[in-house]
Amino acid sequence: MSLVEHFDATLSADPNTRTKAELSLKQLEKEPSFVLAVLQLLSSQEISLPTQQAAVIYLKNRVSRSWSSIDDAPSPLDIPEEQKALFRQNILPVLLQSPMSTRSHLMAILNIILSTDFPEYWPGFSEYTSNLVHSTERCEVYAGLICFHELAKVYRWRLDDRQRDIGPLVAALFPTILQLGQGLINLEDNDSAEMLRLILKTFKSVIALELPPELLANDMILSWIQLLLAVVQKPLPESLMSLEPEVRQSHVWHKCKKWAYYSLNRIFTRYGEPSSLVGDSANKYRAFAKNFITNVVPNILETYIQQTILWTQGQLWLSPRVLYFLGCFYEECVKPKSTWALLKPHLQLLIGSFVFPQLCMSEEDEELWELDPVEFIHKYIDIYDDFNSADVAASRFLVKLASKRKKYTFMGILSFASDILNQYAASPPNEKNPRQKEGALRMVAAVSNSILSKNSPVAGMMQDFLVAHVMPEFTSPVGYLRSRACEMINRFSEIDWSDKSQLLNAYQAVLNCLQDNDLPVRIQAALALQPLMRHLEVHDVMTAHVPIIMQNLLFLANEVDIDALSSCMEEFVSSFSHELTPFASQLAKQLRNTFVKLMQETMDESTTVDDFDSLVDDKSIAAIGILNTLSTMILSLENTVDVLREIEAILLPMINFVLDNNIFDVYAELFEIIDGCTFASKEISPIMWGVYEKLQKVLKESGIEFVEEATPALSNFITYGGKEFASRPDYIAVMVDIIMQVFNSEHLAVNDRVSACKLTELLMLNYRGLLDQYVPAFIEVAGNLLLVTEKPTSQTYRVFLLEVIINALYYNPSMSLGVLEMHQWTLPFFALWFENIPSFTRVHDKKLSLVAILSVISLGAQQVAVAIQDSWGNIMKVMITLLNTLPEALAARAELEKEYDGETFNLSGSGWNDGIDWEADDDEGVDDFAVEYGGPDLGGEISADVVDDFDEFEHFQGNYLLDEDPLFHTLLDQVDPFSLFQEFMVHLKDNSPVTLQDLVKNLEASEQQSLQRLVTEKPSTLAVASDKT
């Protein structure tokens, strides 16, 4: 069977024939010259189009998999270098003569090769491209544009080597393709449009991250802008207007317009607005930006306004994508003074005739509501699915006007919407326009943040507004008005309801909509319940309806996948945990089934299980929300062991499903569930021990990158699994294996090693006497990182590594000192430890250091003094410092524990808009030239040479891992350090007075006073009063 016959057979209707052909191809593809043979097949003009398509798709997948090997391990599918060289020589001629149906795939193949081979293995590609572009043959010019476009795409997001690798080509070809584009725009045929499209997309890729110097030189960029404006203004061919809108959008002339709009917007937002330029960009583009916003933006805005006017008059068709770009540009013009001055005269047109129509339901929207309500939800309710839509851009423009130019626009926006609503209310039933009312309500919802802000002049009117214009629509025969009514209550639920009966009426209306016939209405009702439940009056009434509401939420979760619904369920479970406890098992079973259904559907949609970990879609996001809801429910059941055991059994198949299928996307949330089950019951059940065995296997084989997320669960196994750990050395060995794998890995981050430090510490604290064979290795790995290889500058990382060795000293001081001495680390370790005492801020840190010091001294003062030499004289100073600072740490921890124990949701608290002040924003706008020197320094630069990856995190976020954690408990909680210290001092006084004298001889007067207080006052008194001396 020939190669052509093989690809013919893959298209057969007979599954056996297809399977046989595919298996045969898998054998053939191991031949070194196979990819070249398929490429040569594509050069034949005699092969049918379907066969060519089957062959080119196969070839694209084969090149994608095997052109660049991921690792050094040889594979039968590797393409030999000599075959690659021949393939590079032949692909461009094949591409040149290929039909459109296969050309896009060949372009993708070219892109894959360029991304790995240029310029090192294909140095002649630039010259070849240049020769094609400068050819007098139109087909060769077209091929050159393809080559240039693919190369520009490869370097679109690369900055490091861009100027070196393609800078000369940009300098050589941009004047040529600009001139070519200026000629093509005057033509009407589709081939010319295709060439112009490639030119515009090449320009788009080149300016994605920077404006090349070649464009800024001699103002070439201005000539390009003129070309882009000409494309924007060019009428589409008359023949297009007879086509359906969806077909028009895919036409090549429309694509030219789309990329012209895109590039004009990109230049303005990234390089042309002076006040938004910071750092290096300000230095590079300041001069260009000043000229651009003064002399170019007015022309762009005038062109955009002209296009908008023609669209509003029905004289011009604009696609949703073009409307999106227009909305984005207008939004960017609101803040700068100069562009605001140009935009202001057109506000009535833009608000009334551009924004408002896009916010109204269209005939297509109503059809979508009826025929595909799930898709309607994703488009208009779960808006992150369609964040780049025209109506969302129009809404954002409205929001920017209301927030940044509110004194000029806000009341006008509300007046416009109010007029529409009043007209609707006054019209007889047969003349009411529900689309316009829904659009007006959507306008009001869009500016809700400004309406609800502090000192807002209209916030106090919103109850009457809702009663007049929203409440009646809960019984409207028009489904999308009922949906919008729910959404309006959601947006404005936090107003000050002076009439609580109206609040309860709103709740009842929303609750009724939870049973609505239309799915979008039920979804909006569910989402509206979330803010309503925060009102005490509603919360109390809702208690009676908890089971039925939860049941409805679960039904909805099975019908549609949106993240907001998961958030609603999570808060509902948290707020009504007591009422839901009797139904916890049933709820867990339903949530489990919904989760597994979503995951199974997602796995079925992906081409292979291997692709699953990178697949993020609506279903996986919704599944994550379900896991979060389960976690919340589990924690609400703390100490109800019987119920927790039932839930563990229910969730076990789900846990196994995720771990068995390596569903990395949900590992973090799954580990939280395991953490919750083990923490809430404070013991480890047989079911969870089975999970422990599977968890360690998963971490070892494929998931060690998730050790940080798994650490809380692993910590619980150590803390609450004492009996099993003590009787099962293999359980301890498994934990140690995980720890050492993290420490020895070269690709894990510092925060992962901090997690390993935490697990090491818990083992040594909980299993004294059972870890003798492992402790020397713990000391060696931590000491090597701390004192030899890394010497971390990160405070957090350094403290956790220090505490591994400090724990070892407490565990077995003699053994640990021996290991330190063997490596000659004793002196530097103690010096580093005592030097970093101020960083030991938590109660646990201070107790640990104190008990470790006392354990070391117990070995024999003279022996220890010789071993640590200079640090010996500081031991008493360190202990006094630890004890003096401990009361403050104890008080801080007690306060955190009090907050945690009494933690409830603030049902009567004010809303999240409290932080937004009506008077806060500067309605004068931003001066166009406000940023002259790159903006402020946000804390100084971080040197990559001296700062590790954790330092950068600390630089911006602080040492949060060293903050007190009220949920962190160890056996040291039972230690009274003040009593322990007093007993130690009595023992020294009675048995080693010389050692005592040696320890206190270097104390300052203030330190002696502190010591006197520490040994004479009651421990209970010391624990609550800090040293005043």
UniProtKB/Swiss-Prot annotation:
Functional note: Active in protein import into the nucleus.
Importin N-terminal domain residues: 21-97
PANTHER family membership: D-IMPORTIN 7_RANBP7, IMPORTIN-7, 8, 11
Lineage of origin: Eukaryota, Fungi, Dikarya, Ascomycota, Taphrinomycotina
Subcellular location: Cytoplasm; Nucleus envelope
Family matches, as SMART domains: IBN_N (SM00913)
Name used for this protein in its record: Probable importin c550.11
GO annotations of cellular component type: cytosol; nuclear envelope; nucleus
UniProt keyword annotation of Acetylation present: no
Segments annotated as HEAT repeats: 506-544
Gene Ontology biological process terms, A to Z: mRNA export from nucleus; protein import into nucleus
Keywords: Cytoplasm, Nucleus, Protein transport, Transport
Record GO terms (molecular function): nuclear export signal receptor activity; nuclear import signal receptor activity; small GTPase binding
Cystine crosslinks: none
Principal location class: cytoplasm
Protein's organism: Schizosaccharomyces pombe (strain 972 / ATCC 24843) (Fission yeast)
Signal is among the record's keywords: no
